[in-house]
Amino acid sequence: KIITDLDLFFDLNKDALIISITGTNGKSTTCKIIEKILKFAKYNVKTVGNIGNPILSTSKTKKKYVLILEISSYQLQYSKLFRSQHAAILNISPDHLERHGNMKSYIKIKSRIFFGQNISDYSYINSTNKYSKSIINIFKTKKLKSKLIPIKKLGYNLLIKKINNKYFKSKGNIENM
């Protein structure tokens, strides 16, 4: 039986609130934005994963912690036990095809971020990304239990005008918001 770092991490941190982020681009930025918002709101937050702090570098946390994970397709590929109360797929574009073979396989592996969720959990998908849209079909076919929330970019221009920061002038970072 194979136990992945994600599975072991979840087993050690079942009591924490886990937010996981995957996608081809923007994972680190999105994790940092969420971390800053939650820290500003006085939550105890740790961000781990491919963002520079390996997942298993975090020891068992207390119930009052929010753990933000940046997760790659490599980590999701063999994970069977991992569960995240909030999981998001930001976008998908052709990448890592030398490992996953084709886009269909890559998309299916990315969708595994939702497989361990239950009825009280939330799944967020960028519904304006053509590859991410196909995950909605996987969601229905697999009869996944979490609440699916498709995210659209409608109205984001109003928000960006209120945030006077040159960082959000790039298309990718606007999409991350």
Where are these regions (language model features)?
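Flexible active-site lid/hinge loop adjacent to a nucleotide/diphosphate
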Residues: 61-150, 155-169
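Short, basic phosphate-binding NTP loop
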Residues: 1-20, 41, 159
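Conserved helicase ATPase motor motifs in RecA-like P-loop NTPase domains
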Residues: 19-33
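Short beta-strand-centered segment that lines the nucleotide-binding/catalytic pocket of NTP-utilizing
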Residues: 43-55
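Hydrophobic anchor at the start of a short beta-strand
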Residues: 2, 18, 43-45, 66, ...
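A conserved segment at the C-terminal end of the G1
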Residues: 29-46
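P-loop NTPase switch/communication element
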Residues: 54-62
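Nucleotide phosphate-binding/pyrophosphate-handling subdomain across enzymes
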Residues: 44, 166-177
